[in-house]
Amino acid sequence: MADFDMVLKCWGPVEADYTTHGSLVLTRLFTEHPETLKLFPKFAGIAHGDLAGDAGVSAHGATVLNKLGDLLKARGAHAALLKPLSSSHATKHKIPIINFKLIAEVIGKVMEEKAGLDAAGQTALRNVMAVIIADMEADYKELGFTE
C-alpha cells in the first residue's frame, strides 16, 4: 500500500494531462526500444520524427496512462481491472510481458522529469509495476499465452 500511495502522490500532474504525458511515454518507448514499435501496427507508417506529434500515438498513450491510473488507485486490489487488459494484450495484441517492463521503466523516467517522482518514488513505482506485471503474467499463463 505504501508504494501505491507514494506513486499516487506524484500522479496528479500525469492525470491532469494524460495526452501529453502519454505521447511522451510512447515516443520515448519507441526511441529507446525501437523494436517495440512493431507491436503497434497502426503506427507503422509514421516517420520516427513524427511520432511525438501524432494524434493516434498521443491518444493511445493517454489510454495506457488512464488504465495505469485506475490500477494504481485500486492499490493492489486490481484483479477485476487487470484481467480484461491481460486478456486483450495476450490474445488479441500478442504483447510479450517484457514490453510491460520496458514501458514501466519509461513511465518512471517521464514521471521523474515531469511529475517530480524522486528516487524513493522510482523504487515504489518499480515495486508496484512488478506486482501488476507479475499478475498479468499469471493471467497470460492461464490463457496459454507464452512468448
Curated annotation (Swiss-Prot):
CC terms in the record's Gene Ontology section: extracellular exosome; sarcoplasm
Catalytic activity from the UniProt record: Fe(III)-heme b-[protein] + nitric oxide + H2O = Fe(II)-heme b-[protein] + nitrite + 2 H(+); H2O2 + AH2 = A + 2 H2O
Residues annotated as binding nitrite: H60
Molecular function GO terms recorded: heme binding; metal ion binding; nitrite reductase activity; oxygen binding; oxygen carrier activity; peroxidase activity
Any GO BP annotation: removal of superoxide radicals
Function: Monomeric heme protein which primary function is to store oxygen and facilitate its diffusion within muscle tissues. Reversibly binds oxygen through a pentacoordinated heme iron and enables its timely and efficient release as needed during periods of heightened demand. Depending on the oxidative conditions of tissues and cells, and in addition to its ability to bind oxygen, it also has a nitrite reductase activity whereby it regulates the production of bioactive nitric oxide.
Family recorded in the similarity comment: Belongs to the globin family.
Name of the protein described by the UniProt record: Myoglobin
